[in-house]
Amino acid sequence: MRMELTDEEAADLATTLRGTLGDLSSEIAATDNAAYRDGLRARRASLERVLAKVEVSNPAVGT
């Protein structure tokens, strides 16, 4: 899939992803359920890959 984003949209997406990643890290640390924690870790890894792609496509959002 390909998406074209304006610089502003890319920056907004990166900001949202960073916030979500921070929230996920906190939730991973707080959960005692191993299966749920594994699912959260998988989601975090996926979102980290998306963020990396956004940052590579638009280096201005990497800050």
PLM-predicted stretches and their roles:
Residues 1-23, 27:
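N-terminal acidic leader/helix
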Residues 30, 34-63:
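Short, charge-rich amphipathic interface segments used for partner binding and complex assembly
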